[in-house]
Amino acid sequence: DDRKAHYELYRECFQHIYAICRRYYINKDDCMSALNMVYYKIIKNISSYLSKSKDVPFELWTRKIAINYIIDEFRKNSRYKNLIEPTEVSVYENQMLIEDEFENTIDTEQIVEAVEKLPEMNRAVFNLYVIDGYKHEEIGKLLGISSSTSKVHLHRAKKTLRTLIDDVRKNDSISNKILS
């Protein structure tokens, strides 16, 4: 029964595809819409996977479909095209853009909340680079920007995250002093 098989496939894929979609979409309706479109693409292409891609783990195959769908949506939707002036890129080109990762003194939920507050393009580049492991050249091609612009967006994302996380730490410190 196809309906039962589709349901089982949906249950199998839901958690990891939802996690990918949540990283890129703040709005839960947009996230669920993307998740459903990704699921549709998985169903549509499952025969191709079964005949050609059996050597690739299923979760990796579905992850690639999800990320490709999200990137295609970024390309289609012009509101994600935060353009940067060429002079602004050159200021950052000669600086070290990849800074030390955040200390492990803040919990994951606070980091996720901070990432969700980033501007859309900064968040997309941050997710692609830090979470999904893409290189700047690949991100540039995927998003239709230069690798230098990708580096600028990553730099801005990390700088903003540091500020947001520092604010959380200060608030926690103040709360602890008040409660003591």
Briefly describe each language-model feature range.
Residues 1-19:
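A short, charge-rich alpha-helical start-of-domain segment used by transcription regulators
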Residues 7-11, 28-48:
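Conserved RNAP core-binding helix
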Residues 72, 80-108, 178:
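Internal acidic/polar
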Residues 166-180:
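Short, basic, alpha-helical segments at the C-terminal edge of helix-turn-helix-like DNA-binding modules
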Residues 71, 122, 137, 141-170:
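DNA-recognition helix of helix-turn-helix
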Residues 46-64:
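Short, aromatic/basic-enriched loop-to-helix "N-cap" motif that marks the start
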Residues 110-119:
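Short amphipathic alpha-helical boundary/capping segments
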Residues 125-129:
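A short pre-motif secondary-structure segment
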